[in-house]
From Swiss-Prot:
Species: Pseudomonas aeruginosa (strain UCBPP-PA14)
NCBIfam families, alphabetized: hmgA (TIGR01015)
Name recorded for this polypeptide: Homogentisate 1,2-dioxygenase
Segment forming the signal sequence: none
Gene that encodes the chain: hmgA
Enzyme class: oxidoreductase
Length: 432
């Protein structure tokens, strides 16, 4: 079966023990690795966690495929590597970028990757690397990332992600997650595409605990969608690229690696529509901590300290009384990389536009720009809806080092600090 343009089917849920077969009876019954698998398939295990993890944390999927993944020649290091591979020195300065220009030459998803910042090389199970992607051509090769799990945030253009377990179609205002090591191909449905990626080197992403919020709210498990089995039975030559410790390596296959006919497990790719996020906010006063906007989190061994949080700032009502309503001025232990999918961000009146990005490192002071601050202080505090917007944040506990390419791109705004320069002192000790 080819991965064509027909409508895609999905399975609903987060962390489920899913199962799917593209041919009836392709899944073995009652065991994982029979002496002879149905249809002459090979059984293969893809482990997303160590064997001895607690059952509640374990992730693995059994694949029943036409050709074992082990059948490949040696990988060779590619001459063309990911842009932004070289990290610059850490900087405490606040950074902001205009949208990166779309490529003029034919560029697929892999060639269009630019690493913006990172805090880990990928050789340890911790940290994150952050990328933007810019593409104008569908991939004719396949890819897998041995360094981490990929969280894709499209900003421009729809993507079809053809994975070993089936296909996902994602558009701006949706996200997709591809497990570490899973092979996939990116097809462009609109000719051009731009977006953001968090490469999670740590524990797999999961839903945050809700605490006193209760048993419902934020991103609900039923709204996450996993693919159903679809396979390619092709004997045409194809390049398979892997990312290993930050570098791209490739080999030539004599078949498609997207040849899984059936599978079962919980280590799966999935998508989520950000418009389904159940936003929580104040109905009295003050601005709650932005952790109430967490969609997914990768925890560390320290309870409550995230390796990475994926946070969104969606459309919502602002009703707080006697309150400075924008996100407050802040100095944060965590490191914040922000992007904007559409609309405007309520703490920035200008300069932060869809496709752009910003980086505020540990203890770098930030907050509303002068214009947003003045408007908020003078605002008539009627109920107000922030609409047609979607900003997001990758927040991580380790300091992010920007790449040299990110600091040298013309998209870097050299005057970012100026947005706070016109903040004036209004202090008057004689008047409360």
């Amino acid at each position: 079966m080819n991965l064509d343009s027909t409508a895609l089917a999905y399975q609903s849920g987060f962390g489920n023990e899913f199962s799917s077969e593209a041919l009836p009876g392709a899944l073995p019954v009652g065991q994982n690795s029979p002496q002879k698998a149905p249809y002459g398939l090979y059984a293969e295990l893809l482990s997303g966690t160590a064997f001895t993890m607690a059952r509640s944390e374990a992730r693995r999927t059994w694949l029943y495929r036409i050709t074992p993944s082990a059948k490949h020649p040696p990988f060779r290091r590619l001459e063309r590597q990911i842009a932004g591979a070289e990290l610059d020195a850490p900087t405490p300065n606040r950074l902001r970028w205009d949208p990166l220009a779309l490529p003029e030459q034919p560029t697929d998803f892999l060639d269009g990757l630019l690493r913006m910042a990172a805090n880990a090389p990928g050789d340890k199970p911790a940290g994150v690397s952050i990328y933007q992607y810019l593409a104008n051509r569908s991939m004719e090769r396949c890819f897998y990332d041995a360094d981490g799990e990929l969280l894709l945030v499209p900003q421009l253009g729809r993507l079809r992600l053809c994975t070993e377990l089936g296909a996902l179609q994602v558009e701006p205002l949706e996200i997709a997650v591809i497990p570490r090591g899973m092979k996939f191909r990116v097809e462009l449905l609109d000719g051009e595409a731009r977006g953001y990626i968090a490469e999670n080197h740590g524990a797999p992403l999961r839903l945050p605990d809700l605490g006193p919020i209760g048993s419902n709210g934020l991103a609900n498990p039923r709204d996450f969608l996993a693919p159903v089995a679809r396979y390619e039975d092709s004997r045409q030559p194809l390049q398979l690229v892997q990312k290993y410790l930050g570098e791209l390596w490739a080999c030539e296959l004599d078949h498609s690696p997207l040849d899984v006919v059936a599978w079962h497990g919980n280590n799966v790719p999935y998508k989520y529509d950000l418009r389904r996020f159940n936003t929580i906010g104040t109905v009295s006063f003050d601005h709650p901590d932005p952790s109430i906007f967490t969609v997914l989190t990768s925890p560390t061994s320290v309870h409550g300290l995230a390796n990475i949080d994926f946070v969104i700032f969606p459309p919502r009502w602002m009703v707080a009384e006697n309150t400075f309503r924008p996100p407050w001025f802040h100095r944060n232990l965590m490191n914040e990389f922000m992007g904007l999918i559409q609309g405007a961000y309520d703490a920035k009146a200008g300069g932060f536009v869809p496709g752009g990005a910003s980086l505020h490192s540990c203890m770098s002071a930030h907050g509303p720009d002068a214009e947003s601050c003045d408007k908020a202080i003078a605002a008539d505090l009627k109920p107000h809806r922030i609409d047609q917007t979607m900003a997001f944040m990758f927040e991580t506990s380790q300091v992010l080092r920007p790449s040299r390419a990110a600091l040298e791109t013309p998209a870097l705004q050299n005057d970012y600090d100026a947005c706070w320069a016109s903040l004036v002192s209004t202090f008057n000790p004689q008047r409360r």
